[in-house]
Amino acid sequence: MVLSNEPAASAAEEEVEDDALVRASALEAFGESAETRALLRSLPAVHRERASREVAEERFRVIMDKYQEQPHLLDPHLEWMMNSLLDLVQDETSLPDLVHLAFKFLYIITKVRGYKVFLRLFPHEVANVQPVLDMFTGQNPKDHETWETRYMLLLWLSVTCLIPFDFSRLDGNLSTQTGETRVPTMDRILQIAESYLVVSDKARDAAAVLVSKFITRPDVKQRKMASFLDWSLCTLAHSSFQTIEGVITMDGMLQALAQIFKHGKREDCLPYANTVLQCLDGCRLPESSHTSLRKLGVKLVQRLGLTFLKPKVATWRYQRGCRSLAANLKLCAPGKSDQKLLSDSLTSDGDEDYDVPEGVETVIEQLLVGLKDKDTVVRWSAAKGIGRMAGRLPRELADDVVGSVLDCFSFQETDKAWHGGCLALAELGRRGLLLPSRLSEVVTVILKALTYDEKRGACSVGANVRDAACYVCWAFARAYEPQELTPFVTAISSALVIAAVFDRNVNCRRAASAAFQENVGRQGTFPHGIDILTTADYFAVGNISNCFLIISVFIAGFQEYTKPMIDHLVSMKINHWDGAIRELSAKALHNLTPQVPEYIAMHVFPALLLMTQSPDLHTRHGAILACAEVTYALYKLATQSNRLVTDYLDEKAVQSLKQIHQQLCDRHLYRGLGGELMRQAVCILIEKLSLSRMPFKGDATVEGWQWLINDTLRSLHLVSSHSRQQIKEVAVSALTALCSEYYVKEPGEAGSSIAKELIPQYLAELQSPEEMARCGFSSALGALPGFLLRGHLQQVLSGLRRVTCISPNDVSFAEARRDGLKAISRICQTVGVNTRGPPDEVICKENISEVYAALLGCMSDYTTDSRGDVGAWVREAAMTSLMDLMLLLARTEPVLIEAHICERVMCCVAQQASEKIDRFRAHAARVFLTLLHFDSPPIPHVPHRQELESLFPRSDVATVNWNAPSQAFPLITQLLGLPTYRYHVLLGLAVSVGGLTESTVRHSTQSLFEYMKGIQKDAQVLQSFSETLLKVFEDNLLNDRVSVSLLKMLDQLLANGCFDIFTAEENHPFCVKLLTLCKEEIKKSKDIQKLRSSIAVLCGMVQFNGDVRKKILLQLFLLLGHPFPVIRKSTASQVYEMVLTYSDLVDAEVLDEVMSVLSDTAWDAELPVVREQRNRLCDLLGVPRPQLVPKPIPGS
């Protein structure tokens, strides 16, 4: 909970976690036991081959990693796994590679289970000492491939050196037969340990463990401890953390010293503690940039401090209950006093005369510095050290430590100090070292920490502080009796609820929820704790919108939390740096207003109005949003009791609301980047005040609002791109609400001069040279209420239709066309349909054709620019608008849906459903199926309805993922069997089959081949298909978007024998027409991709018989003489393959010569040379030589 680092400012919060991650994989036993046995038995066989060895190692690693979160499941199997591997190690016949592999497997197990559990399983008899030592002789500390071996050997040695015999007994006679003296065992072990303390790999950690076990032995400490400490301190003093070698050396020394002072007896280590502390001071570790060194420094300092102080349990500490169940029952028995705080019954500490060594002050000082370190792991270690030290100090000195910790919570300190202070307080509280007399001070700073949020640049810091503050509350719940915390229950419970619901960071919300749950369970004094927990549990608070808008309303239903939650939103969240939090806070205030409307109106609303004039942009923005939401909430409350909103708001508040826009305008706050936020906020204010029916009708304020909306729509191109859409939407929504409330004279009649000028003004803006202005005013026209459109409908539809048409000057204005289509659709919904109605007031028989023309015309918008296929936005809007219009007509006036119109709509949508962009294909499929299955009433004249319903049954529609090509294309290609849809589906498929995206090409091609396979035996259907295919080609000649892809598709169809049935007939019309179209397509073309595709098609067409074959070969030989070398080479290569494929193409006598010419000629040589070889081929194959056509002389 508290170990999470501060998240990066740019990191987006993960609101929804994957269920599999949340649940994790709960295992019950080691299920791979048999596989592991087999794997270990196979090591002697696989270790010789590198590939087999790596496969075995990777498989074992995968098996072990599966148990990283539940390593205890391995415990029953550790012994046999270790024995199997050590047998390989101890076998004298094992090769070095096999030994290293066995140690590598041992390390993998150790990594999962932890070395401390693993140590006790190593063989540790006297007989093992010498073999383990001997194994080190063959080790090279610089060999990076075998570091696992050295690591495991050091751990093994650390166990074997614990044998209960003096090492001198193992040495015997140290003299050898050659007169040399052998090194004593004790010295050998120490030399090994010292040498590995300065290596750069993992063996350094194991060497520190070895030192701690070895140096603290009774026989070794007398002879070697002083000299080792002297060596390590000298090495430490002469090392610098400015170099890599120095960092490695210092890390090893610090680890060794920390382990010695942890495992050694106090009386053995005490004589050296002061010297070590002085050396450590001289190293200046807090100045190091290496986290590991600073952490080890703090760890060593605290262990030195614990060495200075006698190990004892402070008699003055606060105790809640006992570890013994029997003792707890005695305390709870009748007649027994339940004194929990021993200091209350003791006027003096039994050890008050205990002399505290001088070094303790230095240790405490360094630990307090560690609390402010920049890294969490260092602060965490320092906090634990503070807790351990305070537990051995007299009461007064421990209280001074608590006071020093509380000094971390000043606003001059950084967020690091606050975080470290919270961790320290949690440790002190958990250990009973924070006496109840200090609780009032501690709770005060913790409440501040729970809302700590400091602005830093474009974001803020403090999430880790709030998280740690939740940990303090969690620790206090376990540490204190309910009566001790009773005075603070209201404040703590409210603060935790606020953090759980309103904190921006998901980890903090979850930490607060956990702390609240712990307090409810342990203390039992939190108001409505169980009810709140069931709603605001760990998983529920994961979604921030759910927290702000739903959970907060439930909790605010309990009066203890209502006002604190509202006050927190106003004071801390309305002015938050994150715009999303400000918007959510405003909506949350809207939802909370019904709980205490009088408090909101009398106290909160005046404060919000004052904040609207703040010089801080974020405060001003949030306050305006909040005023808008609260006003609308008060209006809804007033409406329920047939009252006016002014019954809640006094005249001063109403006037202040009216003046917000003018005050911002006078201060020029609508300009620049901040102006974007102000425009957005005031547009929302306009919308909410209009919906709240504020009494501003006929007031100049309304004119000011109208000016702001118009100016915002007109200047959208000046708004940053990421905010543009949102600002346009809020301005349009404001316009709708404003017109509906303030421009109505009588029901259904416009009553303002501004209203009458609005439509002509907006229609004029539709011709603006700025695309965004067209977008804004198109959307505005679409959002106008029906009474304003009455009498102007034809004029508006004509203006919007001009926006949707492509002209040479606005080809790239795809967004304007998209918004124009949406506006037309929205207007149709607004004015309604009446077949015989007036065309200037409703959609009727006279103007429906104009609407159809606009929508269907945009279905063929394939505009592309630097952003890609921007026309897809237009086509998507056209599909949606057509669907909405068709459904509207079906419900009201189905007679206006004519058969040819319905057929065109369905065919156009089917074409889009077979194209290459996944998202738009899926949208088209949804539109197509909606139109097909709509039954209220059914849409008339749908072509092939019965066949479509059998192909796309209603029950199966929901299960198909239309975004996935593998699921979409097998269904879409079935439409090729329906003559009405064949042309359009084939047109769409051509783009998909000939596209670039691998998955789309593969699945669309496969589905097309499956269809073609099914019609091979039906000559009539195949003939119809081929005619449609040629029709598509003919209609899209020189349209590179379709023709290039179509050529690729034709190549695939020819190569897969889809037209084999036509090859039996000489000069088949399909081949003749296809050749004509290909020649026309590539005539004078310089498009390399198109030319290459056409070469492939021409080579595939050679399979057809008759005179047409000669014409095809002539065309190919023309390409062999093409001006582009790359085309000549490509043609020669494919013709070579073609000759190999179709053996009847060339006479056997000349085959070798033809193949030789094709393969040996340098087709990228000069044109005269190439054409000579090309002509030679023509002669060999009996094809007329191509003749150069002289260029006409100008003026001749």
From Swiss-Prot:
GO cellular component terms, A-Z: adherens junction; bicellular tight junction; centrosome; cytoplasm; lateral plasma membrane
Superkingdom to which the source organism belongs: Eukaryota
The protein's assembly and partners: Found in a complex with at least ARL2, PPP2CB, PPP2R1A, PPP2R2A, PPP2R5E and TBCD. Interacts with PPP2CB. Part of a supercomplex made of cofactors A to E. Cofactors A and D function by capturing and stabilizing tubulin in a quasi-native conformation. Cofactor E binds to the cofactor D-tubulin complex; interaction with cofactor C then causes the release of tubulin polypeptides that are committed to the native state. Interacts with ARL2; interaction is enhanced with the GDP-bound form of ARL2. Does not interact with ARL3, ARL4A and ARL4D. Interacts with beta tubulin. Interacts with TBCE.
Listed InterPro entries: ARM-like, ARM-type_fold, TBCD, Tubulin_specific_chaperoneD_C
Disulfide-bond pairs as recorded: none
Function text: Tubulin-folding protein implicated in the first step of the tubulin folding pathway and required for tubulin complex assembly. Involved in the regulation of microtubule polymerization or depolymerization, it modulates microtubule dynamics by capturing GTP-bound beta-tubulin (TUBB). Its ability to interact with beta tubulin is regulated via its interaction with ARL2. Acts as a GTPase-activating protein (GAP) for ARL2. Induces microtubule disruption in absence of ARL2. Increases degradation of beta tubulin, when overexpressed in polarized cells.
Signal peptide limits: none
Family: Belongs to the TBCD family.
Tagged with keyword Membrane: yes
Protein name: Tubulin-specific chaperone D
GO terms under biological process: adherens junction assembly; bicellular tight junction assembly; cell morphogenesis involved in neuron differentiation; mitotic cell cycle; negative regulation of cell-substrate adhesion; negative regulation of microtubule polymerization; post-chaperonin tubulin folding pathway; protein folding
Record's keyword terms, sorted: Cell junction, Cell membrane, Chaperone, Cytoplasm, Cytoskeleton, GTPase activation, Membrane, Repeat, Tight junction
Subcellular location, record wording: Cell junction, Tight junction; Lateral cell membrane; Cytoplasm; Cell junction, Adherens junction
UniProt KW Chaperone keyword: yes
GO molecular function: beta-tubulin binding; GTPase activator activity
Ranges occupied by HEAT repeats: 363-401, 599-634, 752-788, 1106-1142
